[in-house]
Amino acid sequence: MSEIFEDKTENGKVRPWRERKIENVRYAEYLAILEFKRAHDVRGCGEVLRFRKIGEHLKLYQTWFCHKRLCPLCNWRRSMKNSSQLKQIIAEAVAREPKGRFLFLTLTVKNAHSAEELKVSLRALTKAFNKLTRYKKVTKNLLGYLRSTEITVNEQDGSYNQHLHVLLFVKSSYFKNSNNYLAQAEWAKLWQKALKVDYEPVVHVQAVKANKRKGTDSLQASAEETAKYEVKSADYMTADDERNLVVIKNLEYALAGTRQISYGGLLKQIKQDLKLEDVENGDLVHVGDEDYTKEQMEAAEEVVAKWDFNKQNYFIW
């Protein structure tokens, strides 16, 4: 009998390959029902995983990922890569501007109730954010930023709550006096102006403590919030198949041609200087979780895991 495959992190936590692959297969089934052309390709995502075993650690070195925006397997790998890149960028930003401070900003708009409305709203969000970062009150202390889009689905009415999470890197002078500092109410007014809407949108801003390891105001928590999934699979993998089909169809339409993450200012420059690839279109095999030399990888034992569609698990091959 074949051995069940298990991949653990250095601290002993089991990586969720099985859970993500089960969701991936279900997602592929939904795409097939909706008659999307690539449904069969999606089903083959991460079917065979090839690892190198170095000590007790497994390092993925070969597989095929479908790169679909809503694929739970690809989304998991993407969030890992985003997180890894962001850690490198933040470390370099602090080294270059040691007096710089971080803010975590959440910018919202009214919910969208259809695929078309969501698509239009996502474009408006990006356009308004670009305007916001050009306002004099913002630019005078802004060093750089990372902006990411998140969409949640309302359980009651099925509407879409699209919002931006922004990690702002600002000069220390931002906190010095009222001429530089922007209170939450001022951020809300500027965001309303950028959006060109007749209602006051909900905005939340807080200073982030770079040296604090845990808590919602820690830099790590803010970085993780910014680098996480665009849409949680739980929002389109509910017990209600009919609802899931509607949500997936709407999201596939609305997200086409959009980007989840963008960098600006110093953080964008650092990303270029570090030669970090574009996560949205890039390699999801190497996500920056571990770095080994070519010699180490070539000398290591190979471990191959293959997905069994009937038993719904990976087995050592």
From Swiss-Prot:
Binding, DNA: 229
Cell division in keyword set: no
Entry annotated with the keyword Ribonucleoprotein: no
A Pfam family annotated for this UniProt entry: Rep_1
Top-level taxon of the source organism: Bacteria
GO biological process, alphabetically ordered: DNA replication
Gene Ontology molecular-function annotations: DNA binding
Coiled-coil segments on the chain, per record: none
Similarity section: Belongs to the Gram-positive plasmids replication protein type 1 family.
Function of the protein: Produces a single-strand nick in a specific site of the plasmid, and this nick results in single-strand replication by rolling circle mechanism.
Protein name according to UniProt: Protein rep
Gene: rep
